Amino acid sequence: MIREERLLKVLKAPHISEKSTMVAEKQNTIVFKIAVDATKAEVKAAVAKLFEVEVETVRTLNMKGKTKRSGARVGRRSDWKKAYVTLKAGQDIDFMGAAE
């Protein structure tokens, strides 16, 4: 069993993009930004516990930070990790309802 403090640190935020919106509508999949050291099992447990839904699958991938310039200076954004969480049929996460 994963400690509750760890579950709260695994999920950072929902990742909102054109692709994530299409995937959410067609395949009942939610995309999250997650901690770089998080595992699939931790993500599955965190989503199930925090949103009270049943998770079918979790796919994770590491995103490389982009190189950015500001004048002559060249910098790099941090690497980050995201997870595609597919929910079982009939399950749904309502982010707007949770904000009220």
From Swiss-Prot:
The Gene Ontology biological process terms listed for this entry are: translation
Q: Which GO terms describe its molecular function?
A: rRNA binding; structural constituent of ribosome
Keyword entries, A-Z = Ribonucleoprotein, Ribosomal protein, RNA-binding, rRNA-binding
Which PROSITE patterns does the record match to this protein?
A: RIBOSOMAL_L23
- Cellular component per GO? ribonucleoprotein complex; ribosome
Q: Which HAMAP family does the record match to this protein? A: Ribosomal_uL23_B
In UniProt terms, what function does this protein have?
One of the early assembly proteins it binds 23S rRNA. One of the proteins that surrounds the polypeptide exit tunnel on the outside of the ribosome. Forms the main docking site for trigger factor binding to the ribosome.
Relate the assembly described in the record. Part of the 50S ribosomal subunit. Contacts protein L29, and trigger factor when it is bound to the ribosome.
| Official protein name in the record | Large ribosomal subunit protein uL23
State the species of origin.
Aeromonas salmonicida (strain A449)
